[in-house]
């Protein structure tokens, strides 16, 4: 993207009806590591790929606990995600204190949409550079919601965001009809297979780079990290590797040089 006179501030429209600062914030989501969310009739699952800033650093958390019935996975700026997560936790606490009941998932997502819309319309503010996948369970059943820096939010059956997430979405679209009838173990495996599609061929999922969040009927939101992920990875079939091209024998004569073209 190249700078122009219409991307100096979020309140400036381009002649094409676009707000470039919001589009730039959407690009920040694509820079984050991939995360996948999907649901069945009884459960909602988040699967995220963790990154380490260097070999000396620990892997960053990608799935955050919000309330007993809600959790989120993030792609984009971690600092922005932390602020939004604290806001969501406060709203859930307020609902339990004032109304003595858990906050419905759709209501919480609506509040997030309203909060993230404010910096897209006020001078001197910047949009939140993070996308969220929100998994929850309430009286209406399991939910997977996606939120964007543009303040849009979507109710999804399955979704993936982050770097190389198109490969994961292709897998989800191909197997979407199977998700609703899956048990919990099968649903997690589908999420892991989709997440694995975002990795280069020479890499694979391990207990160090995968985090899993699960919520469902009679099951509070639980995050599985490190050794807790092992039972799910053990049942996952080995990733098919790309076929190696056979090496050309050393004693094989070189190809003849192209003859000059006739004029």
UniProtKB/Swiss-Prot annotation:
Domain of life: Eukaryota
Keyword Glycoprotein on entry: yes
Crosslinked positions (Glycyl lysine isopeptide (Lys-Gly) (interchain with G-Cter in ubiquitin)): 115, 208
Glycan attachment residues as annotated in the record: 110
InterPro entries per record: Ntn_hydrolases_N, Proteasome_alpha, Proteasome_alpha-type, Proteasome_alpha1, Proteasome_asu_N, Proteasome_sua/b
Residues bearing PTM Phosphoserine: 110, 177
Modification N-acetylmethionine occurs at: 1
Function of the molecule: Component of the 20S core proteasome complex involved in the proteolytic degradation of most intracellular proteins. This complex plays numerous essential roles within the cell by associating with different regulatory particles. Associated with two 19S regulatory particles, forms the 26S proteasome and thus participates in the ATP-dependent degradation of ubiquitinated proteins.
Oligomeric form and interacting partners: The 26S proteasome consists of a 20S proteasome core and two 19S regulatory subunits. The 20S proteasome core is a barrel-shaped complex made of 28 subunits that are arranged in four stacked rings. The two outer rings are each formed by seven alpha subunits, and the two inner rings are formed by seven beta subunits. The proteolytic activity is exerted by three beta-subunits PSMB5, PSMB6 and PSMB7. Interacts with NOTCH3. Interacts with ZFAND1.
Family the UniProt entry places it in: Belongs to the peptidase T1A family.
Protein name per UniProt: Proteasome subunit alpha type-1
Organism: Pongo abelii
Phylogenetic classification of the source organism: Eukaryota, Metazoa, Chordata, Craniata, Vertebrata
């Amino acid at each position: 993207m190249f700078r122009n006179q219409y991307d100096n501030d979020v309140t400036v429209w381009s002649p094409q009806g676009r707000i470039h600062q919001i589009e730039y914030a959407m690009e920040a989501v694509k820079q984050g590591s991939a995360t996948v969310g999907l649901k069945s009739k009884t459960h909602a699952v988040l699967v995220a790929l963790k990154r380490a800033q260097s070999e000396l650093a620990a892997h960053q958390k990608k799935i955050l606990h919000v309330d007993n019935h809600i959790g989120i996975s993030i792609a984009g700026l971690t600092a922005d995600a932390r602020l939004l997560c604290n806001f969501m936790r406060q709203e859930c606490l307020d609902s339990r204190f004032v109304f003595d009941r858990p906050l419905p998932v759709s209501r919480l997502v609506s509040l997030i949409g309203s909060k993230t819309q404010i910096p897209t319309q006020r001078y001197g503010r910047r949009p939140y550079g993070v996308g969220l996948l929100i998994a929850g369970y309430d009286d209406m059943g399991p939910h997977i919601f996606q939120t964007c820096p543009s303040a849009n939010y979507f109710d999804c059956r399955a979704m993936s965001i982050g770097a190389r997430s198109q490969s994961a979405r292709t897998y989800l679209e191909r197997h979407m009809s199977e998700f609703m009838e899956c048990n919990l173990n099968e649903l997690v495996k589908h999420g892991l297979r989709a997440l694995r599609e975002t990795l280069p061929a020479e890499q694979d999922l391990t207990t160090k780079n995968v985090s899993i969040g699960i919520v469902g009927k009679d099951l509070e939101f639980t995050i599985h990290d490190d050794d807790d992920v092992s039972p799910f990875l053990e049942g996952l079939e080995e990733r098919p590797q790309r076929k190696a091209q056979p090496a050309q024998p050393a004693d094989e004569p070189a190809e003849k040089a192209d003859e000059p073209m006739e004029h």
